[in-house]
């Protein structure tokens, strides 16, 4: 069997989905969705092109590089490198996503070499990545924190073979709506009310109301480093009104239905906690 040499080249990001140069971007999104379906066996991670496109438009806060991966005439995956402009800007975030039938052909290793070279060219000395690992039996890999583990699956073996180390496990949880689960949520809600006497709840849909922008920006900055990150190098993100505006614009332009809920401390009047709930067009 003859294996085609992979063709890995930068993708042109169109200004709109109707632009003549949008074909490769649309194919990238289609294949991206297939890749996540192959990983998890469901469509939970599926996103529409309109949702993804705003996040690849030029931004003063982050540069996003993306390559398409072809095997012959077939688009089989993508490779991406995110370059935040926060702090000392020493970290790059990498991703390699390939169709399952393109595994074990050296394509991923070739793509990784391109990403590492690009990271060095942009002055980055650390590459970090988040990889989805469905739960599976067999040999496991445990991070230094001792919390959680992942199966030694294809993606884990690839990362370890190339000198990367598992630093932290983040758990993905799913809540299926049912009478039982909603009763459980209602009970948690009552418990929370009993412990949250000094707070009010406020909520909004983008764009963020002017009176909440400063506190929302402060919370976004703090959560970038306050959230557990084990030994990973995380620079604090700098959020201000301009970045909140871009953040909101991405949600709005992508057509996502977003609800932001925040806790406001009654004594100070400041927002002190928040959560974001987003759903995509056509996703139940």
Model-derived segments and spans:
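Short helix-capping and hinge/turn segments at secondary-structure transitions, especially at repeat
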Residues: 221-229, 253-256, 268-272
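Conserved donor-binding loop and adjoining core beta-sheet/short helix segment
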Residues: 32-144, 148, 264-284
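Amphipathic alpha-helical hairpins
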Residues: 227, 241-260
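Acyl-donor-binding surface of acyltransferase catalytic domains
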Residues: 1-7, 112-210
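Short amphipathic alpha-helix that is part of the acyltransferase structural core
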Residues: 1-55, 61, 195-242
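Residue-level preference for long, well-ordered alpha-helices that form the structural scaffold
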Residues: 21-24, 104, 148-151
């Amino acid at each position: 069997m003859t294996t085609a040499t992979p063709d890995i080249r930068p993708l042109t990001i169109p200004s709109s989905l109707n632009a003549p140069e949008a074909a490769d971007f649309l194919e990238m999104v289609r294949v991206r969705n297939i890749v996540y379906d192959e990983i998890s066996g469901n469509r939970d991670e599926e996103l529409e092109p309109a949702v993804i496109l705003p996040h690849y438009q030029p931004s003063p806060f982050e540069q996003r590089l993306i390559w398409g991966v072809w095997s012959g005439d077939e688009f089989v995956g993508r490779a991406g490198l995110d370059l935040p402009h926060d702090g000392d800007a020493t970290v790059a975030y990498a991703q390699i996503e390939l169709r399952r039938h393109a595994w074990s052909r050296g394509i991923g290793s070739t793509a990784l070499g391109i990403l590492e070279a690009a990271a060095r060219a942009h002055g980055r000395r650390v590459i970090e990545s988040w990889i989805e690992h469905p739960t599976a039996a067999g040999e496991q890999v445990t991070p230094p924190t001792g919390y959680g583990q992942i199966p030694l699956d294809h993606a884990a073996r690839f990362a370890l073979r190339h000198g990367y180390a598992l630093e932290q496990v983040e758990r993905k949880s799913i809540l299926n709506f049912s009478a039982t689960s909603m009763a459980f949520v209602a009970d948690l809600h009552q418990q929370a009310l009993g412990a949250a006497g000094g707070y009010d709840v406020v909520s909004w849909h983008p764009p963020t109301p002017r009176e909440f922008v400063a506190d929302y920006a402060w919370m976004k900055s703090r959560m970038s480093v306050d959230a557990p990150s084990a030994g990973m190098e995380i620079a604090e993100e700098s959020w201000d009104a301009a970045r909140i505006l871009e953040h909101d614009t991405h949600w709005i332009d992508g057509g996502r239905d977003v609800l932001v809920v925040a806790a406001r401390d009654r004594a100070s009047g400041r927002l002190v906690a928040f959560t974001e709930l987003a759903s995509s067009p056509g996703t139940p």
